[in-house]
Amino acid sequence: MLRPVETPTREIKKLDGLWAFSLDRENCGIDQRWWESALQESRAIAVPGSFNDQFADADIRNYAGNVWYQREVFIPKGWAGQRIVLRFDAVTHYGKVWVNNQEVMEHQGGYTPFEADVTPYVIAGKSVRITVCVNNELNWQTIPPGMVITDENGKKKQSYFHDFFNYAGIHRSVMLYTTPNTWVDDITVVTHVAQDCNHASVDWQVVANGDVSVELRDADQQVVATGQGTSGTLQVVNPHLWQPGEGYLYELCVTAKSQTECDIYPLRVGIRSVAVKGEQFLINHKPFYFTGFGRHEDADLRGKGFDNVLMVHDHALMDWIGANSYRTSHYPYAEEMLDWADEHGIVVIDETAAVGFNLSLGIGFEAGNKPKELYSEEAVNGETQQAHLQAIKELIARDKNHPSVVMWSIANEPDTRPQGAREYFAPLAEATRKLDPTRPITCVNVMFCDAHTDTISDLFDVLCLNRYYGWYVQSGDLETAEKVLEKELLAWQEKLHQPIIITEYGVDTLAGLHSMYTDMWSEEYQCAWLDMYHRVFDRVSAVVGEQVWNFADFATSQGILRVGGNKKGIFTRDRKPKSAAFLLQKRWTGMNFGEKPQQGGKQ
């Protein structure tokens, strides 16, 4: 799915700003056809943004069910005769949309875009009413899963099995955009780089309802190569490669023409190669070592609402600390984030929202509502698998052309020990490879699924591990934790002979808490714990990356294990550094960029 851009043939009207907002406490909005008139008892709400924290009302913050958004929109007079499309970049977790009284689309899945051609339902030079019913409920057949229960007071309550707050609403931009009636509908680009990096090729495939031509232009807008037709290959001599740390981008200018119209779409292209060879992860045929974070789209007041200021500041902090990569834990991030990564040479592991496929973590289950078996008709079943496949399809369709995206992660921390795990994940791994044969794939492994009990890791190209020795187990005992961690990593290395990326490692740390004795929760313990992990990483040859959990403290559901959210951040939720930020900055900026440190750290 192409991201809307303004060109000589296309225009965009952003609908971000204040909308009318109403809770549907009685779940009567559909029956009463709320889209047919102005919302009653509404209040103003900011879009984009989660609805949960915009008001001083705990009932709204923890609300489960339907909410409604509405606003009047003027259609520019100059849009007459154009194709007009309404697009939502993300509605969490389900959205149904009306233009005036006409239902135009619905979408399940909270982190990927959806759109509809609304040309038949609008008139240029007049206003229309746009109404959206948003539902934030999760069940075992949604991605991510959850359960809706009713408490003793008859109030619905959303439980979920992932450790971050279930923010909901219209989280990203809403827009109208135009195209001519002859238009470019989709583009797929795949780049190949010769072993000596002195030659590259760019394969293109275009979906359009007109005659197609393409021009590849360099960053100075000089034409490098041209082609005709809906598919083909362009040759590039002495290409300027997209590299980690240097986001050089070409532009593939695609034109679709009919006898009376033409459409122009410029797609930014990074020429680079990605491959796994033995225990190495290769970018442009060179071994690459990941440094960085698992992150969250999470901020005070905004929740998961996209914010440009936060994006700029977070990337400034990542640049300062020496991070060269991150994972979109645990859902696809805003497209603006990937554009930034493309431009700045940041390497991204792109993940679906499949998190919480686990009965063993103790998250989200009330007494008596825990299924007996994870992979079963009452929990993760065939319908779940189809929803999961759809999430993979939408992720790849949106992000396939981003050079920063070097690997797909199809799930985070599923329990892969029980019967049924391999039967569930094997078809999804196969489907992901068919959808994109050009990138490695992974499924992030949870701590208790070790080399002896896991049943699926051989289905993937890279082993991504989340490990917390010295925190959840061997608590406070760094000497024992170091031995156990190294023993497990060596067991995986011997079993799979794959690259290993530690996609999560971290400890909860209260900013300002200090200890002469390196006690847990103190800033001193966070530093000592990270130092220990780094010694192990440097000794295990298959480890090709370290992504700390987490970049910043983030909101979670209430519970006795979480005091004001998850505190594993290297930065606080308002982006103040803890002591460990300076430890990481010294380690990561002291490395040769993208290269693994020399082995050392003898015990």
From Swiss-Prot:
Signal peptide: none annotated. Coiled coil: none annotated. Potently inhibited by a set of synthetic compounds like thio-urea derivatives and analogs, and uronic isofagomine (UIFG) derivatives. Inhibitors of gut microbial beta-glucuronidases block the reactivation of glucuronidated cancer drugs, and thereby alleviate drug-induced GI toxicity. PROSITE patterns: GLYCOSYL_HYDROL_F2_1, GLYCOSYL_HYDROL_F2_2. Optimum pH is 5.0-7.5. A motif (N-K motif) lies at residues 566-568. The keyword Hydrolase applies. NCBIfam families: PRK10150.1 (NF007538). The N-K motif seems to be a discriminant that could be employed as a fingerprint to identify beta-glucuronidases from the large GH2 family of proteins. This is Beta-glucuronidase. It comes from Escherichia coli (strain K12).
